[in-house]
UniProtKB/Swiss-Prot annotation:
It catalyses: (9Z,12Z)-octadecadienoate + O2 = (13S)-hydroperoxy-(9Z,11E)-octadecadienoate; (9Z,12Z,15Z)-octadecatrienoate + O2 = (13S)-hydroperoxy-(9Z,11E,15Z)-octadecatrienoate. The keyword Transmembrane does not apply. The gene is LOX2.1. Induction: Transient induction by exogenous methyl jasmonate, reaching a maximum 48 hours after treatment. Not induced by endogenous jasmonic acid resulting from sorbitol stress. It comes from Hordeum vulgare. Keywords: Chloroplast, Dioxygenase, Fatty acid biosynthesis, Fatty acid metabolism, Iron, Lipid biosynthesis, Lipid metabolism, Metal-binding, Oxidoreductase, Oxylipin biosynthesis, Plastid, Transit peptide. One of its GO terms (biological process) is lipid oxidation. Optimum pH is 7. PANTHER family: LIPOXYGENASE. This is Lipoxygenase 2.1, chloroplastic. GO terms for molecular function: linoleate 13S-lipoxygenase activity; metal ion binding. Residues 47-59 have a biased composition (Low complexity). Fe cation binds at residues 587, 592, 777, 781, 936. Belongs to the lipoxygenase family.
Length: 936
């Protein structure tokens, strides 16, 4: 029996907050008894006269985003005595959409029987060999469960020959959609034997969707094991979800289909037409997104018309539902930020720099941590309200008045990096440390040859050999070894964005307010296990009018003050490049964009009865919705990302290049990613040995990976006794084929795609997806504001070229006022305000987040093997918490422990402590566990 432990999807139906200040409600039990808390039962279902009793173990799977899922050992809700009819009863919990008003409730809901439920047999009719006719019943209102949920009941006369109930069908004759909670079916008077259909899905009015909604009992079946009476329903349900590929999708649709990213621009906007290349296809390879079917642009036949509605289509149960009182309204917030970035295009002082480094500090409210959280949404609600009323006024302010306006409107929290050490951003040691313990720890790689070489065409981009020579290296490492010895001993590491960025340098430099170089940064691993930066190389390729320019900068350069300031400028440039690659590649591409095809394919090819669907589904929660919002306001033409990061309008195109050149599914598993970058090797025993022993992201991540992999392997071995069962699973193979051929169609012919032909390959594939959606995303997302919220630490823009490139007046200005040149290189005040606001939002956990190791699917509790496997997984996460805490307090681990150092907690699971992960505590955005899914 479902208990009040699982939140409804999104707002009005979200999980209870740990704070009493928030008003919440959860899915109620369909039948609740005083003092009966959580009721799980042994189902004893039979006629009341001569039947024998059949015992089945029954549990539920609380689907995380609106689909009906679950597991039972056998759903034997049937009449044992085949000579009698039995009266069966169904109880149903329903929440009506807020679109249905008080009048609807009083008249339609109480006085009319608008909800119908059909019982479907799991057996075929022995005489016809066809599916039995369902038994229908009108559901009548029986009372209120609470302020949000209503209880309905129906009775059925079930013939003795009907057999076990294999499914229920639901029809909504009301004119408003409803959220279906639970359906419980049991012989009248035998509630303790009830089997629950955990639905948790929006049911549209029959005039919108003529198909009856189907929900299965909770037993997980491979396709070959499906009861004969519901085989057809299982297949038809998947056909409905696949759709026909035609027509524009409506908000109430549940259809999953694929399309290219052809909706980022807006060619039809008469005031500000924008076009962006189509992402997906031979020219710009890319993962596919959800098809909306909107008409093509009138002015650009390759582009889809931009949505004129606030909502971009995603299948109904993937969308956020009504937001509960006080919850974060991300759509409205991002809409206001988008309006602000649009306004920046015409603001006469949009490029205004900060007047001093101390002025940046004024963005943050020193007393923030002592402020009470506002009762209706806290800081985010405050920002939304003020943005609505004071946006235009803000544009009119000048100088110090504008800075004060930003401070008053946004009231930013002091980022943790600045709160712990105000000078951390300036120190080279911290610059290096953040490459392995910051917000983008998956770009650094081992240097395996010297000189470092480019793979670009020399005729176009200049000499292949890097300007960072052996002499430069040996001078910087004080000749403790030769450059060749440093390579051989695995002492040299680098961030290498040279080949990725260099082809875009001239394009980006034509844009206002940004500049670009091809870049590399080289680091040396010291004897105490920490990294030290030793060189930064910046390159501008030749053009028709100018020869190639490139220069290597080193700490202190020539030992002069001027050289020290040039080094700080060079750091600002490569930090901006790293911030762009982090946001566009490590974050958006590798998690959000690449995951959407897995979700689409799973819903098209895997039945909700399928065990693999149930394993993966918690990891897909809200991802399609957040991606749709991103296409509308974050990654679109002229959106927040283009206005805030170095590549500007080429941002998404650049991520396409990275997808084409770098992305491989088999390398997305953490161990394989580390090996590819040279950051780890496998020893003869198959164990990983890290190139940097104290590598916080890898140390913690491998613990998380191992726990996920073992959980997936045990799960797979339980449902597939032998490898042949995997190969013969038609739904599983169709899912994986569609991921390759449709979801990632531009890479479908690559030889590295794994075959699902063994327990190991299947477990590795599933674990890779589960890791990307949980650990990988947590590592790149939730540290954004704590680390990048202080602009000098992680500037997202570099607006001014290096003075040594230009020379003349630029160099003279730099010598006279180096701090001003550095501030002119950092993002402007406008850009900073936008970046901080969006990073603050993205780094904040949802109040109804589901965390790895703490969210248990009820379906697993009554299956002995799966329940034990999950308990072991849960115990593994608890041990990871202890290990991470121990490492963060170990003075020998200098990359995560030290004076003023931000500890690495992004991959620290939740330990269940009631004070751990309080969504109302806005100082804890980094310390709330690892969410299962990409939900922000």
């Amino acid at each position: 029996m479902l208990t009040a432990t699982k939140p409804l999807v999104g707002g009005a139906c979200a999980a209870p907050s740990s704070s009493a200040r928030r008003r919440t409600f959860v899915v109620p039990e369909a039948r609740r008894k005083p003092g009966n808390g959580r009721r799980t039962s042994v189902s004893k279902v039979g006629s009341t006269s001569t039947s024998t009793t059949t015992t089945t173990t029954t549990t539920l799977s609380a689907d995380s985003n609106g689909a009906a899922v679950g597991t039972v050992t056998r759903p034997d809700v049937h009449v044992q005595d085949r000579t009698h009819a039995t009266e069966m009863k169904a109880t149903v919990t329903v929440h009506m959409s807020k679109a249905a008003g008080v009048r609807d409730f009083l008249y339609d809901l109480i006085l009319k029987t608008w909800l119908h439920v059909d019982l479907v047999s799991s057996e075929l009719d022995p005489q016809t060999g066809q599916e039995r006719e369902p038994i229908s019943g009108a559901v009548k209102h029986s009372g209120r469960v609470d302020d949000e949920w209503d209880m309905y009941e129906a009775t059925f006369k079930v013939p003795a020959s009907f057999g076990p109930i294999g499914a229920v069908q639901v029809t909504n004759y009301h004119h408003s959609e409803m959220l279906l909670g639970d359906i419980e079916v049991f012989p009248t008077g035998q509630e303790e034997s009830a089997v629950t259909f955990h639905c948790k899905s929006w049911i549209d009015p029959s005039h919108c969707t003529p198909d009856k909604r189907v929900f299965f009992p909770a037993h997980s079946y491979l396709p070959s094991q499906t009861p004969k009476g519901v085989e057809g329903l299982r297949k038809r349900e998947l056909e409905i979800l696949r759709g026909t590929g035609c027509g524009e999708r409506k908000e109430h649709d549940r259809i999953y289909d694929y399309d290219v990213y052809n909706d980022l621009g807006n060619p039809d906007d008469d005031n500000n037409p924008t076009t962006r290349p189509v992402l997906g296809g031979k020219e710009h390879p890319y993962p596919r997104r959800c098809r909306t079917g909107r008409p093509r642009s009138k002015k650009d036949p390759f582009s889809e018309e931009r949505s004129h509605k606030e909502h971009i289509y995603v299948p109904r149960d993937e969308a956020f539902t009504e937001r509960k009182m006080g919850a974060f309204d991300t759509k409205k917030f991002m809409s206001q930020l988008h309006a602000l970035t649009t306004g920046l295009k015409t603001a006469k002082h949009k490029s205004q720099s900060f007047p001093s480094l101390s002025a940046i500090d004024q963005l943050y409210d020193d007393n923030f941590r002592n402020q009470p959280v506002q009762p209706e949404g806290g800081k985010l609600r405050f920002v939304i309200d003020l943005l609505e009323t004071e946006l235009l006024h803000l544009f009119k302010l000048e100088g110090a008045a504008f800075l004060e306006g930003i401070r008053r409107v946004f009231k930013f929290e002091t980022p943790e990096i600045h709160d712990r050490d105000k000078f951390a951003w300036f120190r080279d040691e911290e610059f290096a440390r953040q490459t392995i313990a910051g917000m983008n720890p998956m770009s650094i790689q081992l240097v395996t040859e010297f000189p470092i070489k480019s793979n670009l065409d020399e005729a176009t981009y200049g000499p292949a050999d890097s300007l960072i020579t052996k002499e430069v290296v040996e001078e910087q490492i004080r000749r403790v070894m030769t450059a060749d010895e440093a390579v051989q001993n695995k002492k040299l590491f680098m961030l290498d964005y040279h080949d990725l960025l260099l082809p875009y340098v001239h394009k980006v430099r034509k844009l206002d307010g940004t500049t670009l170089y091809g870049s590399r940064a080289l680091f040396f691993l010291t004897a105490d296990g920490t990294l030290r930066p030793i060189a930064i190389e910046l390159t501008r390729p030749k053009s028709k009018k100018k020869p190639q320019w490139r220069q290597v900068f080193t700490p202190g350069c020539d030992g002069s003050v001027t050289g020290s300031w040039l080094w700080q400028l060079a750091k600002a440039h490569i930090l901006a490049h790293d911030a762009g690659v982090h946001q566009l590649v490590s974050h958006w591409l590798r998690t959000h964009a690449c995951t959407e095809p897995y979700i689409i394919a799973a819903n098209r090819q895997l039945s909700q009865m399928h065990p693999v669907y149930r394993l993966l589904h918690p990891h897909f929660r809200f991802t399609m919705e957040i991606n749709a919002q991103a296409r509308a306001m974050l990654i679109n033409a002229g959106g927040i990302i283009e206005g805030s990061f170095v590549p500007g309008e080429y941002s998404l195109e650049l991520s396409s290049v990275a997808y084409d050149q770098q992305w491989r599914f088999d390398m997305e598993a953490l161990p394989e990613d580390l090996i590819r970058r040279g950051m780890a090797v496998r020893n003869p025993n198959g164990e990983l040995e890290l190139a940097i022993e104290d590598y916080p992201y890898a140390n913690d991540g491998l613990l998380v990976w191992d726990a996920i992999k073992q959980w997936a392997l045990t799960y797979v071995q339980h449902y597939y006794p032998c490898a042949a069962d995997i190969v013969d699973d038609e739904e599983l193979q169709a899912w994986w084929t569609e991921v390759r051929t449709k979801g990632h169609a531009d890479k479908q012919d690559e030889p590295w795609w794994p075959e699902l032909d063994s327990h190991e390959n299947l477990a590795q594939t599933l674990a890779t997806i589960m890791w990307v959606t949980s650990g990988h995303h947590a590592a790149v997302n939730f540290g954004q504001y704590p680390m990048a919220g202080y602009i000098p630490n992680r500037p997202t823009m570099a607006r001014r070229n290096m003075p040594t490139e230009i020379g003349g007046d630029d160099m003279r200005d730099f010598v006279e006022a180096p701090e001003k040149v550095l501030l002119d290189t950092f993002p402007s005040q406008y850009q900073s305000a936008i970046v901080l606001a969006i990073l603050d939002l993205l780094s904040t956990h949802s109040s109804d987040e589901e965390y790895m190791g703490t969210h248990e699917e009820p379906a697993w509790t009554k299956d002995g093997v799966i329940n034990q496997a999950f308990e072991e997984f849960k115990e593994s996460t608890r041990k990871i918490v202890e290990q991470v805490d121990e490492w963060n307090n170990d003075p020998d681990r200098k990359n995560r422990h030290g004076a003023g150092m931000v500890p690495y907690v992004l991959l620290r699971p939740s330990d269940g402590d009631p004070t751990d992960g309080d969504p109302t505590d806005e100082k804890m955005v980094m310390e709330m566990g690892i969410p299962n899914s990409i939900s922000i």
